[in-house]
Amino acid sequence: VADFNTENGASVRLWSYEGQPWQQWQFVEAGDGEYRIRNRFTGKVMDLAMSGVCNGTWVHQWSQTAGAGQRWQIVEAGGGKVKLRNVLADKVIDLVGMRVENGTQAQIWQDVFGENQLWKLDPVPERLLNKETPAPTPAAKKPAKTTRTQTEKKNSGKAARRSSKNK
């Protein structure tokens, strides 16, 4: 989450992985093969800005609601990679301008079968889960079943882990 921001509307951006809680996301079952993607640091979930459904709508964090803009499907893409498809928009998480530099904004876009839309989900190592994590926001509720993951974006052999830190 950009600048470790705990407020609603904070941007979700790409950043080199540093093993920090603000770079870790939980996939919380929402039924029907859908998930809410909750940030470990803020307790807020990935959401579509202003419930937008058009190409280029930014992905940000927001307190959990019942809205479909916060529900995602994990779509197998082969080679150990997945796409994250939003239920409301029927579009996948993508990176603005197909960039992989630190600070690149996450957005949704129609599935164009591009590398910039592929993600690798890695379990968070137990040693990181055991680190003291800041208390979640009051809006966060403890889900019945979650999977903690870190996401990784690879391009041209250089790895940049998905994060939310922006400077």
Model-assigned labels for residue ranges:
Residues 1-167:
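Lectin-like carbohydrate-binding module/patch detector with strong preference for beta-trefoil
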